[in-house]
């Protein structure tokens, strides 16, 4: 049987005013909605690609943690840019955030525009070992 947990507007996460969940946890998987350069009040913060990427990844990692997962559980990341010329900067941060031989699968692509005029959006999936989940529930 599938159990679902909806992660919405928890302390330490951006306070979204739109009707979405930060993440949905189903069984041993966590599906994280697109994270932007948004502060904890839910206000978009424009900046350089480096600043926006750090903030978006910070939000992404916070959602993962509030969902009961860790960075090591992340198996897939989807990154949308408004300009692929920014990819080398994001690649550098990505290599700092994830160990060389344990990096999640990833897609990157360019979109025409992102909400609030942002430069990047990050979403992804994390998976816990079922044995690990069983141990947490007992």
Model regions and ranges:
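N-terminal presequence-like segments and the immediate start of the first folded domain
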Residues: 1-58, 62-75, 81-138
